[in-house]
Structures are given as C-alpha cells and as structure tokens.
Amino acid sequence: MSTSPYGGRLPNGLGLSVEPRPGAGLVSVALTVAVGGDADPAGLHGTAHLVEHLMFPRAAASDGPDGGHVARVEGAGGVCNAETHRDHTVFHTTVPAGMLTEVLEWEARRLLTFAPTESVLRTETSVIAEEIRGAAAAGGVWEAALAALHPGSRDAFGTAAELAGATTADVDAFFRRHYRPDAMVLSVVGEVDPDRAAASVERFFAGLPTGPAPAPAPAPGSTPAPAPARTAAPATIRTAPLPSPVSGAVLGHPLPDPVLDRSGHLAHVVLAETLGRTRLPRLTRRDPRIVSARVTCGYHGQWLGGAAPDLLLAQFATVPGAGPRAAADGWREVLTELAERPADPAEHRRALNALLLACHRRADSLTARSVSLGRTALLFPTAPGPDALPGDLARVTPAEVSAAARALLSGPCSVTELTAPTTPTGIGENR
C-alpha cells in the first residue's frame, strides 16, 4: 500500500485529496462544494440549505432493502452528515475502511441522479422550517451581528416563507449551476491506498457534467461594507433586541480577511482565546454587574470555518437592570488592558497551547481532517495547508495580539441587547 498523500484534479475539474492513515481502520470522505447561503437566489433565501437536505434522498420502493443514502451508510456501519455555510457546503461520511469503494459510488450516484420530487421537496422545506425556528429560539446573535456589520448578508439557514414557494425547477437549476465538478473537492482520509482511491474516484466521478459556470456576480455581503468615516469614537451599531433566558448583551466585531491578512486574522484568534481564558473571568470577579462572559471567534465559534466576512463575538450575561452599557464598559476595559500592555509570556503561551491542542485534535479526527482539507482547498487556495496552521499560530506574538485589541477598539462594533422575560408579580403568592 502506498502511504504518500495524493492531490490532483480529474479532467472534469473535480479536486481530489487523499491522505493515508495506516492502521486507522476507518476512512472519511468529505465532498466540499464552493456554494452556500450567499448564493441563494433573490426571494429564495435558504436554497443552498434546501439542496443540502435534498442530497440525502429518502428510500424509494425501487431502492430495495438497502433503503436511501443514509440507510446505506448506516447499514455499512458508518455515519454521514452535512453543513451549509455562507460560502460552502460540505458532506462528510465515515465508514469502515473496507467500504470506501461503495461510499464513493454512493456519493457519485447522488450527484448524478439528483432529481427531487415535489413530495420530497415539501417534506424537506418543512424540516428546514423547524430548523429555522430552532435557530431563532437559540438566539440568532451571530446572524444579528453579521447583518449589522455587513449589510446585505444573511444567514445560511433560510427564510421559511420564501422556501415555501420553492419549486423542483428552482432547486434543480441551483444544483446544475453550482454543483459542478470544478467547484468541488473530494477529500479522503484514513486507511486507504491513494492510487486505488484515485482510480475509484476516476471511475465513479468522471461522468459528472461540467455545466455552465455561474454568472460572476458578487454575493450579498461577501465583502465587508465600506468603513464609515472615522469620528472621535468608533461606529457602534445597535441591532434589535433579542429574547434570552438571561439579560445581557452581545458585542460583535468584523475579523480580518483570512486570505488577505492571515497573520492579522490569527492574532484575533489568539486575542479571543486570551480574553476568554484569563481576562474575562477576572472581569466577572471584579464587576458585580457582569454574571458571565465569553468570546467566540469565527462562524459560530469555528475559526477558519469560512472566508470573509467573519466575526468575533463577546457575549455577556448581566444582572437585571444593568443593560448593555455594563457589557460594553467591561468589554472595552479588557480590550484596553491588552491594547496598552501585552500579555506576559506565560499567559500568551497558555492561550497558544490551548489553540494548538484544538488544532491537533482536529487533525486526529478523520472527519475533521477530511473537511479541513476540502475547505482549505476551496476557500483558502493560496494559503498553506492545514498542517501549517500550528506553526502560524505559534508565530503570533503578544505585540500582535495587542494590535488586534487596538483594532477592535477603533473599529465598528455591533451591540445586541439580550432581554430576559419578566416574571409577573403575584405568581406563587399565598392569598
């Protein structure tokens, strides 16, 4: 068995990356497509999410006892799932290594036979409507900050009312336009022979039609909005309040573009880890108005999980009546501390070590590794591969983290108040 990694493209443009892990006993296959919610047609917000769902065809009578795609994978002792982001969609499957050929055939089959029926379409739009309601109930703070800082941007979940009007012709046109082999990367990681895997991919995927390229129109919100004219204070953008179990506020900041300014982006990642690990816990101990505080970097906490625009969010729970002012005061306080005085070597090293551990855990997971290879190839084609990330992080200096804190202090910030329900008086009283 060859143990050398393989990378290349099929004649139809499909990207392929194969990374052997001898002795793993498993293999993970990720299909990453360079389309997400930013490409949703006008009036059909959520089409990319809907197509993702429709890529998991349900069992039909003609399928026989093995059932639909999910049933086949689970029957082989594997698991599969998918995620729709703003700028890409990824499908990942992990199975015993001996099932790789079958999984590649199934993956190609659902691309070649994509033809959802009206009944399946209506079922999946109902499922997505429930997901949208669940996301709204979970808060929607990331989406609120994104819309404030990057006008025109929308989440990848969708809008239930718009999806209710989607037709099979709509989703078929979207699929034909965007699910082209030259806009996809297939990543295979695990106990696999790269030469045999490449031969199987050629066998099953060579017949994918190339199709017309999408019109070169910029997606809404794909680039940051022009910075407002700088005044004495940075721009603060208030969003509509959001309901929450506890009162508080969420403050959002745009992150540097990870392609155009990779070092600046990673400095913000280290800043977020430093704040969350040491500075915010100290703040909650000394400020009685703040109950808890946390900071996340990247799309729902997945740093380098997407290209620009992306966000850093600071979420605060406060005592009743403190309002968003307490959160804003505390946030500026901890940022100013780091902006004026860099972290000492021990604090900086603890933050770096935590991030490096997360990198190594991702690399250890076959699924995470296969997803990372595809995501890097599509979203960050000029950047070094995922193996360069630990070294790039380790080179971030305390001075660069301080510069990142200064950038947040001087740049735009969204503020979303979290409002907790009030308990009516008299409930539970004995009269």
Residue ranges and their predicted role:
Residues 1-18, 193-240, 392, 398-431:
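Proteolytic maturation boundary segments
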Residues 3, 185-187, 349-431:
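C-terminal regions of mature proteins
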Residues 23, 28-94, 153, 274-292:
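M16/MPP (pitrilysin/insulinase) zinc-metallopeptidase core fold and M16-derived inactive scaffolds
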Residues 33, 60-63, 68-174, 195, ...:
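Acidic/histidine-enriched segments that form metal/cofactor-coordinating
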Residues 74, 250-254, 272-318:
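A structural supersecondary motif
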Residues 127-142, 232, 238-241, 246, ...:
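Short acidic/His-enriched helical or mixed secondary-structure segments at domain edges of catalytic enzymes
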Residues 168-204, 412-414:
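Non-catalytic, conformational "gating/processing" segments within enzyme and secreted inhibitor domains
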